[in-house]
Amino acid sequence: MTTIVNVHAREVLDSRGNPTVEVEVILASGTTGRAIVPSGASTGQFEAVELRDGDKQRYLGKGVLTAVRNVNEVIAEAVVGMDATEQVEVDQAMLALDGTPNKSKLGANAILGVSLATARAAAAELGIPLYRHVGGLTARTLPVPMMNIINGGKHADNNVDMQEFMIFPAGAPSFAESLRMGTEVFHALKSVLKSKGYNTAVGDEGGFAPDLKSNEEAILVILEAIEKAGYKPGQDVFLCMDVASSELFQDGKYVLAGEGNKVLSTEQLIDLWDSWTRQYPIVSIEDGVAEDEWEAWVELTRRIGDRVQLVGDDFFVTNTERLARGIGMNAANAILVKVNQIGTLTETLEAVALAHRNGYSSVMSHRSGETEDTTIADLAVALNCGQIKTGAPSRTDRVAKYNQLLRIEEELGDAAIFAGTSVIRGRKQG
């Protein structure tokens, strides 16, 4: 009864009011799996192609009717009759149908929607949670949330250059407690910002988006908020950053527009990260140098990789070829996992497996354009990532994932393992 009998896509909206693709996969038993595809604002140039219509008269050119049509008329014909529990076969059939290296023919948004909906349908038919269906019996590690509480860069209309300043409540004993700690710091930050006369409106990912005196001030106000909430920085709650430095990279230099167009060389930027990670409890930096600066990644990793998690997002784009090259060069030590960067569940699993086999960490991640879909919460547990990035504890599109993780932790009961400080590099355990 796990045979796919119908596949249907429609155009729906994401958290930014932009169209995206929702797919339903219906099985012979009548069981349905549904998934909605997310979308990013700062996208790596090597990501799989998200198909947009380009009709300026409709949704400012961002419609996805072409991708929807590709699901309903092309992909459906190929996968109807296949077994939904054979995820690899379903994904491979779509990849063969597309035939391009970056999914530009059918669109990664079309292919991913079908891929994730297929997994959901299979799990529902088997009567097991999605994390168990994908990850098997070993899926029981709850991730530490990386909560983006100050938004900058492309995620906010402010003068903060770095895209995300995050808190990482790894000192908690459980996921539920880490979520509580992070949320209390988030509320404390609001009062800290208000006391300084700063705006407390939120950005795309639910974090605050104030204009600050400098990028470093973001760290200082967060440290103040951690203490105000009654926690110890570097013991209970740590800091993480997503620099999204490809967005700052111009003519071989890094330009900090929010600091009066301050220009830094690659060496100066690496010096800055070295300094900040010694001065502050920063345990993870994502995209610390630009996506094409391979030698800079090697140097950054050599300098601070033994004590700081260096995450490749735009650098790796959840792509096994780029990740394998990075591993070979000892560039970075962790991969950010975004299902829509690569475009199928199977390829996502392959990327995480490659990372883990080579001692690289993995961080499951949302996109800035999200929906009520909670698939990534299950995948974080399924793949034992130990870390998840899904925004501030604000906005339903972000909180939906946290609430799903609360359900999973409760369901696992005593079998649940909270990753905690075990994921922090250079930190002695016990």
Curated annotation (Swiss-Prot):
Its main location: cytoplasm. It is found in: Cytoplasm; Secreted; Cell surface. GO terms for biological process: glycolytic process. It catalyses: (2R)-2-phosphoglycerate = phosphoenolpyruvate + H2O. Binds a second Mg(2+) ion via substrate during catalysis. Pfam families: Enolase_C, Enolase_N. One of its GO terms (cellular component) is cell surface. It comes from the Bacteria. SMART domains: Enolase_C, Enolase_N. One of its GO terms (molecular function) is phosphopyruvate hydratase activity. Pathway: Carbohydrate degradation; glycolysis; pyruvate from D-glyceraldehyde 3-phosphate: step 4/5. Mg(2+) binds at residues 242, 286, 313. Gene3D superfamilies: Enolase-like C-terminal domain, Enolase-like, N-terminal domain. (2R)-2-phosphoglycerate binds at residues 163, 338, 367-368, 389. It is an enzyme of class 4 (lyase). Its cofactor is Mg(2+). The active site is at residues 205, 338. Keywords: Cytoplasm, Glycolysis, Lyase, Magnesium, Metal-binding, Secreted. InterPro entries: Enolase, Enolase-like_C_sf, Enolase-like_N, Enolase_C, Enolase_CS, Enolase_N. HAMAP family: Enolase (MF_00318). Catalyzes the reversible conversion of 2-phosphoglycerate (2-PG) into phosphoenolpyruvate (PEP). It is essential for the degradation of carbohydrates via glycolysis. NCBIfam families: eno. PANTHER family: ENOLASE. Belongs to the enolase family. This is Enolase. It comes from Symbiobacterium thermophilum (strain DSM 24528 / JCM 14929 / IAM 14863 / T). The lineage of its organism: Bacteria, Bacillati, Bacillota, Clostridia, Eubacteriales.
